[in-house]
Amino acid sequence: MLLKLETLEQVYPLVKDDPVRPKLPADWRIQNGREVYVLYDDQYAEQDPVLFDGPRAVICVAFTDGIALTEKDLENTTNPNTAMFYTVWSYDKGAGRQIVNEVASHIKKTREEIGRFVTLSPLTEMAERFHIRNGAVFLRKGTLCQNFEYEREKIQ
């Protein structure tokens, strides 16, 4: 089950676990064109028991005008046309991939002004492997971050 977090009380306890951008304040993540989503096991599953208690994964998204290459660029939210996935972490194997796919699908269905789905990823081999394996294509590398794009047409 995908849940959009609306309050500081919901976001604050999770920020301490952010391995990519732990210094970004919790309140900043849910203001001015930025959102936080959490993936949980479906608590109402009839066939399978709930296997994971608590959040399985978290993703933070900024809706920006163009592609961000720095954290500062994530504040350019006045005329958004791009969903920037700027941090994702998981507590359960496979949940990172699942939350990226589910949030991209949700945004595609609910925000028609968003035409691109791009990451603001750290310059690590792990980030590169994660996004390439999930179907993203490499866009560019900056001095502090790199971008990968999930093509809109391929998002379910």
State what each model feature region is.
Residues Y44, G66, T124-E125:
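Short, solvent-exposed loop/turn segments at secondary-structure junctions
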Residues M1-Q31, V38:
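Short amphipathic alpha-helix that is part of the acyltransferase structural core
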Residues L51-P55, I59-A83:
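Conserved acyl-donor/pantetheine-binding loop and adjacent beta-alpha core of acyl/acetyltransferases
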Residues M1-L3, T110, K154-Q156:
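Short, Lys/Arg-enriched, disordered terminal segments
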Residues E71-G135, T143:
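Acyl-donor binding region in acyl/amide transferases
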Residues T143-Q156:
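C-terminal "cap" of GNAT-fold acetyltransferases
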Residues D27-F63:
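Conserved beta-hairpin
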